[in-house]
Amino acid sequence: MNPASPDFSFETAALAGGALHVAGVDEVGRGPLAGPVTAAAVIMDPGNIPPGLNDSKRLTGAVRERLHDWLLSHARVAIAHASVDEIDSLNILRASHLAMERAVAELSPDHALIDGNMIPRNLGCGAQAIVKGDARSLSIAAASIVAKVTRDRIMVDLAQQYPGYGWERNAGYPTKTHLQALLDFGVTPVHRRSFGPVHNILCQGKSVTS
């Protein structure tokens, strides 16, 4: 049985409750050892939903790219990040919430639908946390696509600056290639020093790549 596709029911309920602008919010990049965490907030027009819109994890790279470009042209979209320094100083959960707060602040919606089971504390609007929201809400699905494509592109650019870690393929996640490269080449300025595998390399006295 195919999993159900996301729909507009959460947005419709919020609009019926008096909200004028409802944003779906998602983030990507909690698990990688390198790079920022990226969040997107998207306000969709209920009368203009692109076919095939779904959780980014259910889509091919080509479809994600196409939908990303469509959303930037046809929806209200905000993208924000929390840096590696912020991740290391705050912790990854708080940093991911900070990125979501920044994205929401750019759109100033009346209500936000947040992927997951926690609501960031400084959203500035009413909000609902939806577990597996990227597979249930079209607005969150849209945000998941924008966030993933944006961050993947950032990691491709960083891979040009720091070759050998495979970020153009692994997006900074701890793949075998990435972990071996840490041993071979050391830690870069865009690695998250608070994350175990990176911290362990530093404790071994591995030189930091400039």
Positions of the model-derived regions?
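RNase H-like, Mg2+-dependent phosphodiesterase core
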Residues: M1-S210
